[in-house]
Structure formats: C-alpha cells, structure tokens
Amino acid sequence: ADVGFAQCGLRRDYVEGTHTSPVGYLEGVFVQEEYRGRGVATALLRACEAWAGEKGCAEFASDCGLDNAASAVFHLRAGFAEAGRIICFTKRL
C-alpha cells in the first residue's frame, strides 16, 4: 500500500536564501495520516536530498505556508533553516 510520496525537482532560478545553482527543491511531501510520526516523511526527504546530490546540487530548499505549523516543525527538525517569509499577491487582468 502507498503510505506517502514526495516530489522534488531542480530549480535553476533564484531560490530564497541559496547561493548556488541548481538547487534541489522539495516541492511537496505527503504521508497518509495513519503513517505519520513514523519517519516516513523524513525518509522521503532523505531520498530527495540524495537524488539532488547526485544531480550536482550543493543546496536543498523547500517552502511551506505561513499557517502550516506542522510543516514548519518538520522542516526545522529535518535541518532546514528559515530563509525568509513572503506574501503572495494576485490580481485579475
């Protein structure tokens, strides 16, 4: 049974707080609720980091919404440091 997934990629444009390019980027991670707290997300993250390292990345980054406290805790526990906060805007044309 699938218990979760992670999506990662390479970003060659500017990534907040980084100094190299490309940067490995965790686009998203999800673990089914009944499997949370068992290290699944951390294992998925480590696999993404290993993949990015194989692609020549010296840095790895991610983001989460300001209101997603659980994700912020996950990132900090996984060794990430907060690089900044942004407010996103849209408008109709």
Which ranges hold each PLM region?
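A short, polar/charged loop-to-alpha-helix boundary motif
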Residues: 12-20
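Active-site/acyl-donor-binding loops of N-acyltransferases
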Residues: 84-93
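Conserved acetyl-CoA binding element of GNAT-fold acetyltransferases
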Residues: 19-33, 87-88
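Conserved acetyl-CoA-binding loop of GNAT-fold acetyltransferases
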Residues: 57, 76-85
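Conserved beta-strand in the GNAT
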Residues: 1-10, 25, 30
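Conserved GNAT acetyl-CoA-binding A-motif
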Residues: 45, 52-64
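Conserved beta-strand-loop-alpha-helix junction that forms the acyl-donor binding cleft
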Residues: 60-71, 90
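Conserved acetyl-CoA-binding loop-helix of GNAT-fold acetyltransferases
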Residues: 27, 31, 37-50, 73-77
